[in-house]
Amino acid sequence: MTTQTRIPPTELTGMFGSIVKLAARRMLGRVPESMGVLAHHPKLMRASMGIGRKIDGLDALDQNLSSLAVMAVAANIGCSWCLDFNYYKAHNEGLDEVKAREVPNWRAASVFTSLERDVMAYAEAMSQTPPAVTDEQSAALLEQLGPAALIELTAKVAFMNMSSRMNIALGIYSEGYADSCDLPALASTGPIANAAPDA
């Protein structure tokens, strides 16, 4: 990482801190600096991680569609940490890496199905201020996915909006997860808004 977060990380302490560090090392090989930032507010960290795990564990929506949707949010908002982490996660979960790699440039890429494009367009529309989801978008996805999967898609996009915007505001940048497993660089249509500036 070539920049500092806006709030300096603190040590993860106590029973909860020990559990978080153990889980992070098991899943990622190290403890992300972002966890040290959130450790300043353990109740918020616990709540955010809890809802994140629960939302991630839902299964009405196809896992590849879910991955594409949250990465489209991260790319649209400009969260380099979220893009890097979710690309790494797609690799580790055996999802379609070629498609995950192309998400930042999905409108120009030829690898996506029409359903995948509809999902990413919905994710981007939800991420606008104010949200720009249309009746037509919702109706098309309702027909293709069914109500439970559409509700799950909406919840996952909403949670990624919260996470992305929080990371950007706190100055939390990519920590090189995808690099650690030699994934090819993500496609790009230009610089990600919160890509770490050169020190």
Which ranges hold each PLM region?
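Hydrophobic alpha-helical segments
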Residues: 1-199
